């Protein structure tokens, strides 16, 4: 596999650019300069999360033991680790791509409890150690496509979700699998204040059909680049479904519930005309406000080094997953 060069100072976005982005975000949220000057506790609380200097930084993740199955070592150029861990959507910690890395250091992931229940014969609770020791870990190099029309290639580490589901023995009534993120507004500022969290309803929830969850490509991910996940990437466990848009990859999961009926999902509740339940990567179905025909590749270059490439149906995994949607109108069921 081709090695990707590391970031240099020339690749770093100028600090002024980040301040401008945040100013635009605040303006879009209706927070004016005059309003920000008011000495209220609420505004002080909001602004404290944008200063970026006194928040705890997360320690480096512990090295993990894992194998590299040949079928998942795609011959693709990896996105530099710095960008995988520094360019994130995790609105619980802010709207700017740099906010999660800056703000998530206070997220404590050990101890952790993940409960699996609902339409199962054998409910199960996993602790922090179970997440990395109960199942053999694998490194899988997957494409990652955001609904915002940018993409990465990431060496995720984890285990197939179907192995966990087999342990709990889904009942014949189980048709869907629902996931829920940790709810902790005291350490997740986006849950505490709608100006920081994009106005979403929290805790963040996502779901898959049972057959999607059982597919061999679907992973519960506990690491990246050889180490345990950092908080900004969804530690200690997140969902990875490589043929779907990134917002399906729910982070910091605390519960998995098998259900009879289709569960609600956060972005679909927020804007059902823009974010469908399925969220399969599809170059032929545009977002109402932008095209999905191509994508911006997040690579080793700087902000002016923009590479675009055509978007692949199912993000390049059509041979493996297209049969799941046989007979389904992908334009209606986006």
From Swiss-Prot:
It is found in: Periplasm. GO terms for cellular component: periplasmic space. Binds 1 Mo-molybdopterin (Mo-MPT) cofactor per subunit. This is Protein-methionine-sulfoxide reductase catalytic subunit MsrP. Predicted to be exported by the Tat system. The position of the signal peptide cleavage has not been experimentally proven. GO terms for molecular function: metal ion binding; molybdopterin cofactor binding; oxidoreductase activity, acting on a sulfur group of donors, quinone or similar compound as acceptor. The keyword Signal applies.
